[in-house]
Amino acid sequence: MEDKPFFSVIVPAHNSAEWIRKGLDSIRAQVWDNYELIVVCDACTDNTEEIAREYTDKVIITGFGLDGMARNTGLDAARGEWVLFMDDDDWFLHEYVFRQLAFMVGTHGEDMLLFSFVWKDRGYTSQEKQMYIAVWCKCWYREFIGETRFSDRPYWSDVDFMKAIMAKQPRVHRWDMPMYYYNYLRPHSISWRKKQGEIE
């Protein structure tokens, strides 16, 4: 029987051939290698899938066109004890992220670990940003997530997910250490389109 990985790293990707390598390289560079990488290529029409297969054999093809549904597909396939999400245009800050996260969750034993991140548009880190609604600045205990899933809304599905998670009253540990680079204003991303007024 194949051993269960410690982390499942889920990356929903949509037409991200131009920028996904940086994030996948940041995962490949980790000195802690007890993880599985799951890339969900969702409604891709470029060569994102081809690039993803250079990094993992766990590439899932879907046609939702929705980040939340793509994340659900990754969760359904995840075998790890802990779950991390990474957006297709972001990356982990250094090669010791997984080792440090493994130490922290092993030491504190909560259901959810919140960590800080660097925000490209602002250029700073802040402890208050740990409670940001996004799912990528958190490490999740897989059994606690259980059957909780993202909604099928085009935007803000992570808000629905977080509401459902917080209703379960998780044990939370906050760690003021930046682990993640959030590429807030990559052209044509959802955040960029919101700032341009394309999305209400």
Regions found by a protein language model. Name each.
Residues 125-198:
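Conserved nucleotide-sugar donor-binding catalytic segment
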Residues 83:
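Short aromatic/hydrophobic "clamp" motif used to bind/position activated sugar donors
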Residues 26, 33, 41-50, 87, ...:
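A conserved acidic beta->alpha catalytic loop
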Residues 91, 95-125:
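Conserved donor NDP-sugar-binding/catalytic core segment of glycosyltransferases
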Residues 62-78:
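Glycine-rich, basic loop-to-helix element that forms the pyrophosphate-binding segment
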Residues 5-8, 26, 36, 160:
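Cell-envelope/extracellular polymer assembly enzymes that use nucleotide-activated donors
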Residues 18-21, 46-54:
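Acidic helix N-cap motif at the loop->helix transition within catalytic regions
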Residues 15-29:
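Short, well-formed alpha-helical segments that are part of the catalytic scaffolds
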